[in-house]
Amino acid sequence: RDCKSDSHKFHGACFSDTNCANVCQTEGFTRGKCDGIHCHCIKDC
């Protein structure tokens, strides 16, 4: 099961899944992707 959370460190509009994922990894998540203009972090629960 995936747990999703808005990124707390990502600033600005999200246009790159790679940038979002890199920021999410610094927050303890395994991956991340853009959802609209927001960066959402994902990890296994």
From Swiss-Prot:
Top-level taxon of the source organism: Eukaryota
Keywords noted in UniProt: Antimicrobial, Disulfide bond, Fungicide, Plant defense
Disulfide bonds: C3-C45, C14-C34, C20-C39, C24-C41
InterPro entries named among the record's database cross-references: Defensin_plant (IPR008176), Scorpion_toxin-like (IPR003614), Scorpion_toxin-like_sf (IPR036574)
Pfam family, one: Gamma-thionin
Example GO biological process: killing of cells of another organism
Family: Belongs to the DEFL family.
Functional description taken from the UniProt entry: Plant defense peptide.
Name of the featured protein: Defensin Tk-AMP-D3
The species this protein was found in: Triticum kiharae (Wheat)
